[in-house]
Amino acid sequence: MILSNEPGYYRTGHYGIRLENLIVVRPAEPIPGGEIAMHGFETLTLAPFDRRLIRADLLTAAELRWLDAYHARVRDEIGPMVGGEVLAWLEAATAPL
């Protein structure tokens, strides 16, 4: 099953921001003590988040690790399909925070 994950924040009369990715439901690794099969999500949409809109000082260490890992995946999967200026942009856009 494919879903749209759309976390957002809207301030009435001022502005709004929303991040949107498509995700697919996949079987997950069993957890210790788990009695039933579990599922998790895998991100399908691979595009870097705009670094100009990220305040890294407001993110936890775990959030920074997730974002850097996501950007590494974007770079690893999209990078081989592009070259030249596009690759240079992608490498800059997905560099670790």
Regions found by a protein language model. Give the residues of each.
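Charged, cofactor-coupling segments
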Residues: 1-97
